[in-house]
Amino acid sequence: MLGLLGSTALVGWITGAAVAVLLLLLLLATCLFHGRQDCDVERNRTAAGGNRVRRAQPWPFRRRGHLGIFHHHRHPGHVSHVPNVGLHHHHHPRHTPHHLHHHHHPHRHHPRHAR
């Protein structure tokens, strides 16, 4: 009886160690893959006023922020039932300082507006 109990405990230790190593490798792979800063340059001059740079993210992390933090944007006229949880803030392209500065008056140095 003690031989069977000893072999069962040994199998349990080996299984537990294997699971722990696999979880550690998964965590390491997730951190390395998520921490990698591959930048995709998206050229959209009319909407963004220049080149926008966004980070490439793997599919499990898209639209969720960092591992389960809710990422909720408030839009005008939209009544939200979910409170704004997390530390994210959404910026519209028209709210950038460059666009605020040039929003209400023409570009004097631009050839179209020169008289």
UniProtKB/Swiss-Prot annotation:
Q: Where is this region: Disordered?
A: 86-115
Provide the topology term for how it sits in the membrane.
Single-pass membrane protein
Decide whether keyword Phosphoprotein is in the record. Answer: no
Q: Which Pfam families match?
A: HRCT1 (PF15758)
- Biased-composition ranges, Basic residues, are 87-115
Location comes to: Membrane
Instruction: Give the range the annotation lists for the signal sequence.
Output: none
Q: Which residues cross the membrane?
A: 9-29
Q: Which domain of life is it from?
A: Eukaryota
Any one GO CC term of this protein is: membrane
Q: Which UniProt keywords apply?
A: Membrane, Transmembrane, Transmembrane helix
Q: What is this protein called?
A: Histidine-rich carboxyl terminus protein 1
Query: What species was this sequence derived from?
Result: Homo sapiens
Highest lineage ranks of the organism? Eukaryota, Metazoa, Chordata, Craniata, Vertebrata
Gene this chain is encoded by: HRCT1
